[in-house]
């Protein structure tokens, strides 16, 4: 597809570009960047004056629930939600039914995405067979099938020797390992952050140590193996400190956090609000500040949503039995732009966190507007105001703690391979 994007503020950290430029896409790839570009007659054009033009945003941690759990979400609805949030690519976690631990399931997702998805969908395979944490999955086959990473997300690989072998094997074949880091014995029957609020509500708590201990293990295993590891959804002061120190001594560790961890505290659980129930749980104000600081100083490499759709019947129940997780694809950019408005990040940092660096971690040929690159583009209006309403969310599920919130800033065009797949 051909497209001319005219006069926007192009921000592309992969090239060190922050300037008002035109972007010309031809046959789905970036043909030229410059001022006053001319396009062949009949080429569609977008006037991006006053708007921000970035490489397509990438969410490296989503749950599309397909196969097997399509009553919550499916590839079509999840991709519509992604497009509405400004994401041109998503990487989907393997805790489906059946799990993504075979070439057949990975191929199913890739083929279904080709016919139904508005955006690029990259599957993540399991670290272990069946996601059971007992023996390694066929990582080589998963990579050959198109998986961009492996993870047992939803639960940790508890066996340290098995995780060591996973890191070493993944290093050998060049695939990213994403760790869901928590000590299940410490988590116990906890359902929210352990602290004043959990005590007041009479709910069993999950201590910050459950995350910190598990993150420390992954760091030491990666250091020992000389292998990279990516830590999913960090949420604590300690996790950020451990990773910051590890990076300083050369450990190949990267990590992500989610918008809810730098926006909400465990106070959001008051009223037994199940849309504020997730894993890891919402933490304290000090933890929120640590996430903002980690994003600002480069300790945290990526912002990922952990988009986790659930049917109302799984959320409209007692807090103790409600399932963990929230939808996040359509609110992520607005919540992240708030950090720019607050002066905690600049736009170049934000684009790196939401596009360039996720692409690098997953080994994707995305996250850049270099000539010859795939023509995936997100066009953002930083001043556009909107309200989060369940009826207007594209996701099949509506389990968001941000319903009713007034937001500022959102994607107004999402472009995949030169084709506009979403327009606000």
UniProtKB/Swiss-Prot annotation:
PROSITE patterns the UniProt entry points to: DIHYDROOROTASE_1, DIHYDROOROTASE_2
Pfam families in the record: Amidohydro_1
Example of a GO MF term: allantoinase activity
Superkingdom of this protein's organism: Bacteria
Task of the protein: Catalyzes the reversible cyclization of carbamoyl aspartate to dihydroorotate.
Cofactor: Zn(2+)
Cofactor note: Binds 2 Zn(2+) ions per subunit.
BP-aspect Gene Ontology terms: 'de novo' UMP biosynthetic process; purine nucleobase catabolic process
One term under GO cellular component: cytoplasm
UniProt organism field: Citrifermentans bemidjiense (strain ATCC BAA-1014 / DSM 16622 / JCM 12645 / Bem) (Geobacter bemidjiensis)
Positions of the catalytic residues: 306
Family: Belongs to the metallo-dependent hydrolases superfamily. DHOase family. Class I DHOase subfamily.
InterPro entries: Amidohydro-rel, DHOase, DHOase/Allantoinase_Hydrolase, Dihydroorotase_CS, Metal-dep_hydrolase_composite, Metal_Hydrolase
Keywords in alphabetical order: Hydrolase, Metal-binding, Pyrimidine biosynthesis, Zinc
EC number: 3.5.2.3
Protein name: Dihydroorotase
Pathway entry: Pyrimidine metabolism; UMP biosynthesis via de novo pathway; (S)-dihydroorotate from bicarbonate: step 3/3
Binding site for substrate: 63-65, 95, 279, 310
Binding residues annotated for Zn(2+) 1, in chain numbering: 61, 63, 153, 306
Binding site for Zn(2+) 2: 153, 180, 233
Chemical reaction(s) catalysed: (S)-dihydroorotate + H2O = N-carbamoyl-L-aspartate + H(+)
